[in-house]
Every structure is written in structure tokens, then in C-alpha cells.
């Protein structure tokens, strides 16, 4: 029971918040309005927060260009709360068609920023940076609205369909978007992730006797770096590992992109292998720091 309570909001709290929300719904000049006071907001916010916690995979301390994963988490939970409240209000409004004409949130960028600033500890600069990143860019090749769900109607208005927030995988979409933008922070994150992968391999290789391990070693010319290499002294053989952090594909274009990433990685390994075979002593010296030996792999 305690485990279940840690994952889900008590039913009575959500039920009470839902009842208060429904009771507050009214129409002014044909537009829906409703309360988002603390007794309503906090209950739905906690539900959205628990959803994030139960599905999150990225370390909060990871930094992007102008914000961290922790900042993005606060932004997303707040905007998801707003979307959920708005969706419930439309469904329970009693208006024909569940008030479908009001289903899409339309506000100025300043209004969106202020709502999130009032409900979180984020600075307006961080909020604005995230909002700008998530605003749809039609010039971005093979873009998808799930990556950038805010749509600019004009310079003073942004439109947001709540289901694009509520039905998305925020961390995965964020990484995919940054990768698509070829942002420097993506490559920084890739290096961080590869470091985590190296640590995971270390937990295994650290238990194996008579091996040498090398990481992040540079090779001459245009050859790629060696991400991870293992020299087994008993069999006198070397394993070269090319580490790749690939975001799971969820569209045809991403499937092709992952195939290209894998082909590129295989090509890099092939180049390193050819160098190791043709210049074995030099390879061992550069990667493992060993002088020329008669007992080379």
C-alpha cells in the first residue's frame, strides 16, 4: 500500500481538486475560464510530477546550452499541469462538443512564461529559452510537432494542443530535437553518456584478471578516437569498442538516421582495426602506452 501511495496521488485529493475545477468553470465572451488556485493546481501538479519521476531517465544535472534537465523538468511538469487542467475543463464544461473550439491553448509568449514563472522556481530567462526551443520551426528538416509543440500564430500568440504535451515522452523528444538541431550540447551529452557506458563496462572488466583497459585514446591523422579497448594478456588479443548512444527511433526518418549512425560507427571501427593490424606496435603504444614488444597481438 505504501509503495502504491508513493506512485499515485490519493484518490480523494484528485477527486476534490477535480470537483473544485468543474465548479469553477464559466464562460466569458464565449471563452472558457476556470480556477487554477493552489487547491486545484497543486493536486494536478503532483500527479504530473509523479508521472515524470516514474518515467525519467536523464540525470537532472545534465546541462544544455541555456538550461539543465532539472530546469526542463520543472517547465514540463508546469505546462503539463496547465494542459491537463485545461483539457478537463473543456471536457467537463457542458458545452457542445466538449467546447472543442477552446481545446487548443492560445496565449502570448509572455503569458506562457509568466504562468510557468509563477508556478515554479525557474527564471524567466530559462523559461523563455525552453519555450523558444519548443516553438515549431518549419525550416527544420523533417521536423515533427511532437518535438516542438508550441506553434506561432503570429508574433503575439502561441498555440498549444494539450495532448501534444500529455501524450509525449518529454526527455526522449528533447534529446531527439537537440540531435536534429545538431546542437553542441547534444555532443556534450553524448560524451557524458559514453562516460556512463564506460563506467558500466568497467564494473565487468574490473573483475577480470590479466587484462589491460584503455579509454578515450587518440589515434593519428583522421582516425577516430578509441572509446574503449581491452587487451587480454592470456589470449594475446585486443577488443576495440566503439560506443554509440542512440535515441530509440519512433519514425521512418529516425530509423534511417539510426542506420546511418550505426554504419558510421562500423566504418570507424573498420578504420581503427585496419590501423591496428597494419601498425600493431604503434597502435599498442598509443592506446595502451606499451613500448614495442615481440609478444604483440
Predicted features, each with a name:
Residues 1-297:
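Intrinsically disordered, low-complexity Ser/Thr/Pro/Gly-rich regulatory segments
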